[in-house]
Amino acid sequence: GLKKKTGDLFKYVINDNRVNNNEILHIGDNIEGDVRVPSGMGINTYHIPRAIDIAKFYTPEMKSWVDTVSLNKTPLLDAVVTTISNRYYDDESQLKLSPYCADKFKFGYQAFGPVIIGFTSWIKKIAIENNIKKLYFLSRDTKVAYDCFNILYPDINIESHYIYSSRRSVSIPLFKSKKDLLVEVYKTIYSTTISAWLENRFGITKDQYSVEVLQKYSLKDYDHPIGGKFSKDKLSQLVCELSDIILENAKQERINLIDYLSSHGMDTNENIAVVDIGYAASMQSAYQKILNKENIHGIYYATFNSALKNVSDSSLLHGYSVHLENPSSPKYGICSHRFFYETIFCDADNSFIKPIKTNNGFEIVKSKFDDSTRQTVVKEIHSGVLALAHDLAENYSSSVLNGYIDPSLGSFLFDSFLKTPNKNDAEMFKGVLFEDATGPNIRRYLFVPDEYKNDKKTIDNMIWKEAASLFINPTPSQDVKIKSEPPVKNINNTISTKQNKNDKVKAKPSECKQNRVAVIERVIFELFLKGKKKNKYLRDRSMFFKDSNNKFISHYYKIIGSKF
């Protein structure tokens, strides 16, 4: 057939319509077939850069990502890049303050979204390959993956459940003897009070033992401080004295937990899998012991070699981005920025403590840790992730959605941001605390709030060290606008869409396509209208269309032109 790149199609149109070459305006997005070839024939051209081409010139990271993807393309990854480009890079005139414009939704859609979409598609693949009938997404780290799974694969013949889960919820039900309790005593103790330690580590509250019992072991009251230097012998003696209470409580928690898990069908003989962020398969191992069920698989974003200490059968372990490797490996983003990954994976909810059986089901007991700032940030980020999932589900077939995304490409933008953060974007995480129930009792931020921006100790304790360096060694480049370049240079006889450098007006995403149509309309009408009609169009566009007797022009204005 006739092709643009050879010029045959243009020759046919010119001859068929009996027009001169310079009386034609050709509009297209391909620099070769839509611009260079027709321009060489004397045809007027109007180049509309593709969204993906605009994206490549937005930031160095976007260009590197798009170029790398083009060399390692899979249908699903291509769909993700195209969808992101069409949403955010359809207008080359947009103002570029920073890669994500400090927009948490955009960050979720563009940077974190590909991480979760890739993980979710791989979860499906692993479940099918291992004949897994039920997937159990564990709170809070895989709520966003659970939601994406149900958006992308609503008709799959695999049950998906979201269950409340935490290290605390299984550690106490696993206590069955004094020996188990003494092992817990000799673990690291960070600065706390005796009552808080007994509640967090052994599950018993103040109303279950007296102050007099504490005083036998040099503990004056419930709020007596303890830490790493407090006598382990005295704590061992105290725990032994309280062992009957602790073990009875553990037994009841175990019964409640088994009933809760069974209510979700985990007591089945079929192959099932828990889905979690990672790393050492401790939750998988705990459920195997509590339910006395070996055929529980673990599907993780990352697994470390320590997982084999908990689950010896490696065929039950599945890692997406990292599998059974050293947790200190610098080549994986989740290894170098583990706490940040955990904080952003984690749903906007409080940590699960235990289920309590009631007449109407189960009461879900959660921690009271003040996590409001993180939860507000995560809600917006996760809403961006889910919007990406919805857009993919609405626009692509199951054959595409069933594809694969290389984890390093899925996390490319996210990891780039963590390694070289722009300060304007980094401030999206201002005041977000990292929660560590078993770690030291200090406030550790992803990005310090304003009241601590000059507090060296608080900055030193930031878990995001690259962001901390912005306070210690600020560089001018962190606050300047990103310099943009036009996707293509103007060529002879070509009309460019590039705006004046001084034009600071930022079009809203919803207006981008309307703006583009308006520009195209003006170019066409200025080119082909003559004399009074052209002057009337330029003077009063609305009146020009309303007074026109041309059916095509009137129909165009009614359907399209009147919208802007």
Residue ranges and their predicted role:
Residues 1-2, 97-115, 237-252:
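Glycine-rich phosphate-binding "P-loop"
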Residues 6-34:
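Conserved Lys-Pro-Asp/Glu-containing loop-to-beta segment of HAD-superfamily phosphomonoesterases
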Residues 30-45:
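Acidic, divalent-metal-coordinating active-site segment for phosphoryl/phosphodiester hydrolysis
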Residues 53-54, 60-61, 65-92, 112, ...:
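Mature, well-folded catalytic/scaffold domains that follow N-terminal targeting or propeptide regions
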Residues 132-139, 272-275:
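Short glycine-rich phosphate-binding loop at a beta-alpha junction
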Residues 156-200:
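Long, charge-dense
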Residues 216-278:
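A charged, amphipathic alpha-helical module
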Residues 492-564:
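Membrane-proximal basic amphipathic "stem/tether" segments
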